[in-house]
Amino acid sequence: MSLNRNQFLDNFQNRLSAQFTGTQNWWTKSLFHFTDIKNAISIIENGKIYSRNKVIELNLMQNDNANDSVILNTNNEHKNYVRLYFGPSTPTQKNNEGIKPKDKIFQNAHCPIPIMFVFDFKKIFLLQNIRFTDGNLATNPNIYENIEYLNNLNFNLIYHRSWLQNDEMKSKIINARHSEVIVRDELNLENNLRFIAVRSEAEKEYLLYCLSDIMKRIFENKIFVQPQTGIFTNDWLYVDRVSLFENQLNITWHLCGNLSCSGKFKLYV
């Protein structure tokens, strides 16, 4: 490698960001990990994201929002890695995100209140023992260790978020969207995290409420409500705002994007 690791990453990111405009442009500086709020609280309190196997070993799993069949078909060795995506709003996230009617939940894949941890692309790739893939780990993709192979990835497919035609490219694009960066066992938030994104003021307030006082002080200025476009799919029901006025509770909802959840929810206060 003619350039050192730091120089290579600077050069690569400059070239990558020049290829994309709008939403995808800021993705070139970031890596993404989404999980349900219950898991997010544990991550923040522990100061790190653990691999799936480590989370189970430490009994820290609060909400297993993964698809049963995907987990079943994932090599157990791959479960020893923390998994980050190159871009948000992946097909998996779209399938899992939001409060959904029971008849719309497939194989227990459900993330009612998603929290997005946004990491610094360069800082992650400067860590030791970083690997990355050209597809979903569950599909046994190519796994690379040498960062020069970043040049082999097709970011036009990885960042593709347009409507998918039912043709031979569909499965290839879906798999590419799930290209990952993997970190052995655990990933520290400190020095690597850019910010945490949530969907609404209500979800931000709830997340902060659930944190310990010390973590609340540390993270209250790092949690933002949809600071950039494209982080969440916003397809399903969620609470946008909650206010209390003269003993009256007011809840403002973000409604479903279609009629498939009409009349299927009950609210208990």
Give residue ranges: language-model regions.
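Active-site-proximal loop/hinge segments that shape catalytic or ion-binding/gating pockets
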Residues: 2-269
